[in-house]
């Protein structure tokens, strides 16, 4: 993927850049691997907003991506197409298996139309192949990693992300995540070789608010710009800093997002590195 800059014909296009989509080989998705995707507008079944900054956006259909790949062990597949997926930052690859099945997977960096991929213990260490972590050598770059065996991939699924297999200790593998966190997962968990493609996506500049609206993202208003009835930071004479440590609209301290009693915390060896403010 390469990033193209637009000509400064308007103020919005002056700072705008976009992907050239050179890796995309087909525009229309495979019909049997689509499902309906309804919009919620961030509302629950009572019509109340439970997730802010969501609404509008282009109509989408969900692409059924295979995050397990365990039922096709030993069956080789050919990459028929690399396709765009509006529901994620990564590209997806359409696989045609020798037994006639068709599946979508995340397209790793370097995977091309016509390549052959495989899953199972006999698969080579090559981008796009899926194996149990116990069959993967230490130091390999991985993506689409399971947290529990058979659960389906949970880690390193967005564009350009990857996990490094640092070591193996007993029945566990030690992984270094993109955030800097080091954690253990079972050697029976599956992972896919390589890093997720479309890594240059971070260099794309939207250029105007409308491109966010096309994606279904609504504006985010600062608390200090609100009234006291709307936010703890609201009000004051003139412009103020809020007068207190940053909090959510409901008064909870900002920045802490991880649940305190999450069961999988016992597998974390080192927490993710804090970003400097």
From Swiss-Prot:
Gene3D superfamilies from the UniProt entry: 2.30.30.30, Nucleic acid-binding proteins (2.40.50.140), Ribosomal protein L2, domain 3 (4.10.950.10)
Compositional bias per record (Basic and acidic residues), positions renumbered to this chain: 253-268
UniProtKB keywords: Ribonucleoprotein, Ribosomal protein, RNA-binding, rRNA-binding
Pfam family, one: Ribosomal_L2
One annotated GO molecular function: rRNA binding
Region (Disordered): 225-277
InterPro entries linked to this entry: NA-bd_OB-fold, Rib_uL2_dom2, Ribosomal_uL2, Ribosomal_uL2_bac/org-type, Ribosomal_uL2_C, Ribosomal_uL2_CS, Ribosomal_uL2_dom3, Ribosomal_uL2_RNA-bd_dom
Highest taxon in the source lineage: Bacteria
GO biological process: cytoplasmic translation
Keyword Chloroplast carried by entry: no
Record's GO cellular component terms: large ribosomal subunit
Subunit structure: Part of the 50S ribosomal subunit. Forms a bridge to the 30S subunit in the 70S ribosome.
Cross-referenced NCBIfam families: rplB_bact
Described purpose of this protein according to its UniProt entry: One of the primary rRNA binding proteins. Required for association of the 30S and 50S subunits to form the 70S ribosome, for tRNA binding and peptide bond formation. It has been suggested to have peptidyltransferase activity; this is somewhat controversial. Makes several contacts with the 16S rRNA in the 70S ribosome.
HAMAP family per UniProt: Ribosomal_uL2_B (MF_01320_B)
Protein family per UniProt: Belongs to the universal ribosomal protein uL2 family.
Protein name: Large ribosomal subunit protein uL2
Taxonomic source organism: Tropheryma whipplei (strain Twist) (Whipple's bacillus)
Primary gene name: rplB
């Amino acid at each position: 993927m390469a990033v193209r800059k637009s000509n400064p014909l308007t103020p919005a296009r002056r700072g705008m850049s976009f992907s050239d989509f050179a890796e995309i080989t087909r525009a229309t998705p495979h019909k049997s691997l689509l499902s309906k995707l309804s919009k919620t507008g961030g509302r629950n079944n009572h019509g109340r907003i439970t997730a802010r900054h969501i609404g509008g956006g282009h109509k989408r259909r969900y692409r059924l991506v295979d995050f397990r790949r365990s039922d096709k062990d030993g069956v080789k597949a050919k990459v028929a197409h690399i396709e765009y997926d509006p529901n994620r930052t990564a590209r997806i690859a359409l696989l045609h298996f020798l037994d006639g099945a068709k599946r979508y997977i995340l397209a790793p960096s370097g995977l091309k139309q016509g390549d052959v991929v495989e899953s199972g213990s006999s698969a080579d260490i090559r981008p796009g192949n899926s194996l149990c972590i116990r069959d993967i050598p230490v130091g390999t770059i991985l993506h689409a990693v399971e947290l529990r065996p058979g659960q389906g991939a949970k880690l390193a699924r967005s564009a350009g992300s990857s996990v490094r297999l640092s070591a193996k200790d007993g029945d566990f593998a030690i992984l270094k995540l993109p955030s800097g966190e080091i954690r253990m997962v079972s050697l029976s968990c599956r992972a896919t070789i390589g890093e997720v493609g479309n890594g240059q996506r971070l260099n794309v500049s939207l250029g105007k608010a409308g491109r966010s609206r096309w994606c279904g993202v609504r504006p985010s208003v600062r608390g200090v710009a609100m009234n006291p009835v709307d936010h703890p930071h609201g009000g004051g004479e003139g412009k103020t800093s809020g007068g207190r440590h940053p909090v959510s609209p409901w008064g909870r301290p900002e920045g802490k997002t991880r649940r305190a009693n999450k069961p999988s915390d016992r597998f974390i060896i080192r927490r993710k590195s804090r970003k400097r403010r």
